[in-house]
Structures are given as C-alpha cells and as structure tokens.
C-alpha cells in the first residue's frame, strides 16, 4: 500500500497528491483521488467522493503528500485533521518518509 501512495506522490509531483486508505475485507487499500486545489502545496478532495467513501467504507486515513519537504504536518493539516476526525497519513516525496497525524 505505501508503494502505491509513493507512486501516486511521484506522479503528481510537484503538486500534492491526495487519497484515502480504506479497510476492504480486512485489508488496507489506497484509493488515489484527484487533487482539486490550484495551489501546488495544498490539497482538496471532492466532497461528494469523500462522503461516498465515508458512507460505504471504513476510512482509515486521509492521505496527502508534501513535495520536497519533510512529512511534518502543517498548521492547516492539524486543523483539518481535527475537523474531519480521521487520522492523516502524510508522506514526503522524494524522501519517501511518512507520519501519521491523529485528530
């Protein structure tokens, strides 16, 4: 799964990638989503898509990447993670490191 996330981060660089990790039949599965943000250092998921996964799946993590930075959460990440109430998995690319931010 992490390999899929890092591949998505590579494909989207220098923009942030975003997606969801869901539990699917007791397995974790990464779902890449389109980043709707026009800013390269921000991410925005489609709200309808997020709600659809929220209603039909167990979302384990909200995922996004930081390009050419470490994986430390920004103030915006901390605020959004608390608002959503789901852990954030933040990856750095090209360093290929990650951190998990709890709400």
Predicted segments, located by residue:
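Conserved beta-strand-loop surface patch within small alpha/beta domains used
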Residues: 1-58, 68-103
